[in-house]
């Protein structure tokens, strides 16, 4: 068994996997990696099953010390990672020698990085997943939903010898301001015509009041003209519009039901891009039909089949 000791951490550093499924009828949310694409690539670099537990590091402030020689993988944001002061770029596997320190300093490009280990980090499964949901006290190293803390030990049982990189063609360019695809929802026709124009033709700024439950988009207030709604199930990526007219994108740790009208839901690929945006960043929304969104999603999944 190989071990890493956490030397520094923040409440935003969490153990995550693909999340919990089949439990929303119990009032339990999904959880899981906010940028599932990057987590999958981190696992792919080590030949892991793509949904194995990895460390989600948001905005930096995380450091580990290797207790034995090991080979790990890093994908996602550039958070100024360093090995004993030497810069380490993401989208590759790398060797960390016994006693060496891997440290994440600050965001240089993107918001979330994913650190994976051969065979995945050891953690108990709660309702079929190790994903950490702090609000629900589920998942994580102890199964109680706690963030990673200084002094804790990360262990794993696998071993990999080959160092490799994610092909350049498959790495997302986090500098691009790609529109976020939105599958239209049932209440879309109950917003004013001007609001529908503004939704897709105006920029939206990410509010600093953001967490793993949701991100508020700041811009022109939208006007809902329909009747009050009865609460209903909320899918991942749902874009709700509360009475103040400022949309909220609901993320992995969202509540399971809600009663605000919805514009629709962002696609999984759009959510992965949104997860890498810092507060204050501007985004645009683009309407897409479900068939197109599904086809693009399936095509993206084919990328992980490369050897």
What are these regions (language model features)?
Residues 1-307:
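Conserved "landmark" site that anchors the functional core of diverse proteins
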């Amino acid at each position: 068994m190989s071990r890493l000791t956490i030397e520094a951490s923040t409440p935003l550093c969490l153990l995550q996997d693909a999340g919990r499924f089949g439990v929303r009828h119990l009032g339990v949310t999904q959880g899981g990696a906010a940028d599932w694409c990057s987590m999958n690539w981190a696992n792919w670099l080590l030949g892991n099953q793509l949904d194995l537990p990895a460390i989600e590091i948001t905005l930096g402030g995380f450091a580990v010390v290797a207790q034995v020689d090991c080979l790990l993988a890093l994908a996602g944001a550039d958070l100024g990672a360093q090995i004993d002061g030497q810069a380490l770029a993401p989208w590759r596997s790398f060797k960390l020698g016994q006693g060496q320190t891997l440290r994440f300093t600050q965001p240089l490009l993107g918001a979330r990085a994913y650190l994976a280990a051969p065979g995945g980090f050891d953690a108990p499964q709660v309702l079929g997943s190790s994903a950490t949901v702090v609000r629900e006290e589920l998942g994580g190293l102890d199964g109680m939903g706690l963030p990673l803390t200084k002094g804790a030990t990360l262990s794993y049982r696998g071993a990999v010898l080959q160092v490799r990189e994610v092909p350049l063609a498959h790495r997302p360019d986090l500098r691009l301001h790609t529109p976020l695809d939105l599958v239209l929802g049932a209440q879309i026709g109950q917003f004013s015509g001007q609001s529908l124009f503004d939704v897709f033709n105006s920029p939206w700024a990410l509010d600093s009041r953001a967490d793993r439950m949701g991100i508020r988009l700041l811009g022109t207030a939208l006007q809902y003209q329909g009747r009050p709604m009865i609460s209903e199930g909320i899918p991942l990526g749902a874009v709700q519009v509360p009475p103040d007219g400022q949309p909220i994108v609901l993320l992995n740790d969202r509540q399971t039901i809600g009663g605000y009208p919805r514009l629709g839901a962002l696609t999984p690929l759009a959510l992965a891009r949104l997860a890498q945006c810092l507060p204050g960043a501007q985004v645009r929304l683009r309407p897409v039909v479900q068939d197109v969104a599904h086809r693009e999603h399936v095509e993206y999944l084919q990328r992980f089949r490369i050897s």
